[in-house]
Structures are given as structure tokens and as C-alpha cells.
């Protein structure tokens, strides 16, 4: 038996034991957060089990809470989840947008601060990209961030901020330098949601 065959058998057994019946059919996906909205008690159990295993973000490094799986192992995980009808336990901008950017560009300290919480669904993230007059043209953003000691003072507007009414935290693009060239001088900034 190859390592991948052994992994498939272990994965199949783990899923059979740990995936609650209600999570083996189509339905809502939890977005996490401090006050998560579970449509069924099994949803909370599934999120906790998959988060503990790192399988909400299976290919992220284990040192940041992810599963540390190779592409081949992740393919097997997805195939075995599909075979029993298991749905993903967590969906969020943290997983889809912020996490990959942090893995690529963040400092070690920033990765350790944010990634484990994303894996476990600890926070519901919203994005602050679009601005009045610029829509999806992110290079034309005008919201400014001015460094003030260890902090930034942010001044500007964001619109169409999906899920801002439910989010615990926001990640947004802000300008830290002059607008020319307009693709330079931008920063991805994370912050507690303004509703805190």
C-alpha cells in the first residue's frame, strides 16, 4: 500500500467517524465568528472537528493551524468528502481571500496572529475594497492610512462591504503612499469591525 492509499483509508475512516449525519447533505455553510449562526447543532460539531484537524484549510501549513496536506492528499480529502456527501464546514473571506494573501506576504507575527483563528472560524471577516467613484478599480482607491507610531490613522470611505453587518473583523485596502504610479503604495490592513 502506498502512502497515498494509506492516507485515503485513514481519511475515509476519520470522515466516517467524525462527520455528523446532518453534514452529509446539502445545506448552509457556517461563516464563523464570535456569534456563529449554525443552522443545525451538527454544524458546530463539524466545524470544531474539522478545525481541530486543520481541514477547514487543508493545504495551509500545520504551524498556522492548517492541515499541512499536499495537493494529492487534499484531492483525496475532497474526493472522500464528496463520496459521503460531506459539505465544507466553513466558508469565509478569511479562508478565500485574506488567508492566502497573509500566507504569501505577511510577517511571521501576522501569520501567527490571524491564520489559526481563520482555520477555526473564530472571526467572521468582511472585505473593504470598493470605494465611491472607483467601484472595483482597486488601483484608484483613495482611502488613506497614515502611520502614527505603532498604529495607522485611516481616513476614507468603503462601500458594498459584504457582510459588514455581521463581521467581527475587516480587511481593507488603503493607500499609504502617493497615487502615482497608482498600483503602488497600497496596504492590506486588518482591523476589528467598526461595529465593535
Describe each PLM feature range.
Residues 1-92, 109, 113-120:
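Amphipathic, small/basic residue-rich leader segments at the start of a protein or domain
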Residues 151, 155-191:
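A short core secondary-structure module
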Residues 4, 54, 107, 127, ...:
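Buried hydrophobic positions in well-ordered alpha/beta secondary-structure cores of metabolic enzymes
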Residues 143-146:
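A structural signal for short hydrophobic beta-strand segments in well-ordered beta-sheet cores
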Amino acid at each position: 500500500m502506498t502512502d497515498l492509499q494509506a492516507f485515503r483509508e485513514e481519511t475515509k475512516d476519520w470522515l466516517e467517524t467524525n462527520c455528523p449525519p446532518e453534514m452529509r447533505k446539502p445545506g448552509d455553510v457556517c461563516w464563523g465568528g464570535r456569534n456563529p449562526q449554525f443552522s443545525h447543532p451538527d454544524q458546530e460539531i463539524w466545524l470544531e472537528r474539522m478545525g481541530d484537524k486543520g481541514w477547514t484549510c487543508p493545504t495551509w501549513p500545520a504551524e498556522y493551524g492548517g492541515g499541512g496536506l499536499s495537493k494529492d492528499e487534499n484531492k483525496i480529502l475532497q474526493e472522500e468528502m464528496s463520496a459521503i456527501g460531506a459539505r465544507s464546514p466553513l466558508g469565509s473571506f478569511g479562508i478565500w481571500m485574506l488567508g492566502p494573501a497573509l500566507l504569501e506576504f505577511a510577517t511571521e507575527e501576522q501569520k501567527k496572529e490571524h491564520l489559526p483563528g481563520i482555520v477555526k472560524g473564530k472571526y467572521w471577516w468582511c472585505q473593504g475594497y470598493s470605494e465611491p467613484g472607483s467601484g472595483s478599480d482597486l488601483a484608484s482607491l483613495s482611502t488613506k492610512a497614515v502611520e502614527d507610531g505603532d498604529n495607522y490613522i485611516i481616513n476614507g470611505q468603503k462601500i458594498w462591504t459584504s457582510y459588514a453587518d455581521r463581521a467581527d473583523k475587516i480587511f481593507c485596502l488603503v493607500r499609504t503612499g502617493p497615487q502615482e504610479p497608482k498600483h503602488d503604495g497600497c496596504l492590506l490592513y486588518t482591523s476589528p469591525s467598526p461595529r465593535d
